[in-house]
Structure formats: structure tokens, C-alpha cells
Amino acid sequence: MKTLFLLCATAALCLFASCESPTKQMPYNQGINVIPKPLSLVQNEGSFKVTKSTKFYASTPEAKTIATFFASKIESSTGYDLAISEEEVSSNAIALLIDNSLEVNDEGYTLDATDKLVSIKAKTAKGLFYGMQTLMQLLPAEIESTTVVNGIAWTLPCVTIKDEPRFAYRGIMLDPCRHFIPVENIKKQLDVLALFKINQFHWHLTEDQGWRIEIKKYPKLTEIGSKRIDGEGTEYGGFYTQEQIKEVVAYATGRFINVIPEIELPGHALAAISAYPELSCKSDSLSPRIIWGVEEDVYCAGKEETFKFLEDVIAEVVPLFPGEYFHIGGDECPKVRWEKCPLCQKRMREN
């Protein structure tokens, strides 16, 4: 029995040791934290130091635009006003080069950092932008500060990186309908998305709980539909003017982020119906929803007014967003009202 116990204990210890051993291995490029993980990264000896005399070298006007963007960011945290040269610089410089012969896709780049020069190459300005975002992550985290930070050695490790995204679409969806998010906060989020090379921003602009985009042809959408009374009797609301929408889109575009607007239909439409009751099957007087869940009152599919309204709204929204996609929701639409609505039933029979 004693022998059996010792054998079992030994086996258990061996199993435990085998489970533990991976955690004792050297972490991926210890001390280098780049998100997302580059396709290939080799850490070399030494480091490159950014100083007040460091320059950007921009090989093309596109590269100069990227250099200008990041020179401003670097100045915010370091206080260094880095010069941008259109003539080749061989040392103490960050070189941004367009190279159509690179074996990467249009969002890919290479980054080669020695103790004298950082060279970033890409086929496009977008690739250079992502290469610079990697460089920013290689520097101390304080580089993202919006105020000058003193006492920091602005160094990055000597590395050789080749990178391109695995997925063409890399996005998030933001819902400012249930909880309104001011423009300045959205800009901060876009900055973070750009840092992590996210390229799609899905903006959920309408919901049961609030309509958040100005539509000039239908002013009640924001006069009524953007506001709700919370459980304590306090009015809660907010919306984006069309000028603010343009401002956010321009801000995102400058960070190579495409903005996809969403006008939810045929469900999740109580805020719009509260503003224009004739858009529903019952035409009752309603208010934007103050709780979560699925609302039974949806756009009436039997009324021509509904389709005219949606066409008008989309006609105003589309020009504000130059991207390829327009999102119309389509989820969670109860059929309760349609089943009892003569106009909806008539349309169903005829189509």
C-alpha cells in the first residue's frame, strides 16, 4: 500500500511538473509588447533613442503626411519638435518609405530598427501608419501622453519586423443609443482603435432607447426621439448634429478607420416611432424605451409612409459617410404587431 501511494504521488508530481513547464519558458519577445502580435519579429542587440535632434525622413508626400501626424503625437509627450526632412537622412532618424516591391499586402509594412536608424517601409500610407503605430508601442507607454512627460528615456529595442493583418475587416460596434457618448469621448476611442490597427468603426445610431443622429427632414427624431425619462424622472438624451458626424468621420479617416453607420430597422425603432407614431401599426403615442429587452412596437411594414420615411432618412445619412457599407440592423423584430395589422397582412398576401 505504501509503495502504491509513493507511485501515485510520483506520477502526480510528474504530471504537475509537465503542466507547469510551459509557464517557465521565455515569454514571446520578453519586454516587447506589440498588439496585435506582428507576423514576424526578431529582437536584435541594442536600442534606438529618440532625442530632440531626431528627424523624420519622408520619401513621398504621403509619407510626409504620416510623419506630420506622428511628429505631433511625439511632441505632445516628449516636448521634442522633430523636424521632417524630404532629403534622405542616414542616422538619428525615422525613415518612412513607400516601396511597391515589398512582399506584404496594402496594410502591411516592415520595420527595421538599429541603434542609428529606424526604417519603416510599406506599399501605402496606411501601411506606414500601422508601422508607426508599432513604433509607438515599442517606445515607453508614456509616449501616448497628451502632456509632456519628463525623465523618460525614449528608447525602443532594435528589432526587425515584417507584418500585415490576417483579417481585412477588424472592427468594433459602438452603441451610443442606450448610453450617449459625446464626440470627444468617441475621438479618444478612435485613437485607441488606431493604436491597435482596428480599421472599421460600426456606429449604432438608432435604437428603442434613443435616436442619435440629426435628420433635417424629420426634426422630431431628435427633438423627441433622442430623449427619454429615466427611472428617477430625469430627462436623459443627446444626439449628434450632421456637422459633428462629419467631424467624427474626418477624425476616423485621418486614422485609416472607416465609419459604418447603422440605422436600425425594422425593429429597435421605438425612438423613431415615439417621434412619428404614424410609422407604427397602431399609431399610439409612445415614448423611447427606458429598459432593455425587445420592443414589440416596430416599423409598420404595411404603410407606404414607412418606406418613404426610411428612404428620406437614408438619403440624408449616406452622404455623411463615404465608406462602402451602410448597416440596416435587421435583428430582433417581433412579428406581433404585423400579425394583427390589416395593412401588413395585405402586403404579405400581395407580395
Feature locations, PLM:
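Sec-dependent signal peptide recognition
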Residues: 2-9
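C-terminal motif of bacterial Sec signal peptides marking the signal peptidase cleavage site
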Residues: 15-18
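A general secondary-structure junction signal
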Residues: 86-88, 98-100, 207, 263-265, ...
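Contiguous, structured surface segment used for ligand recognition
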Residues: 20-167
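Feature activates predominantly on carbohydrate-active enzymes
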Residues: 102-325, 341
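Aromatic- and carboxylate-enriched substrate-binding clefts and catalytic-loop regions
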Residues: 284-292, 329-351
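Charged, low-complexity intrinsically disordered tails and linkers
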Residues: 20-34, 309-330
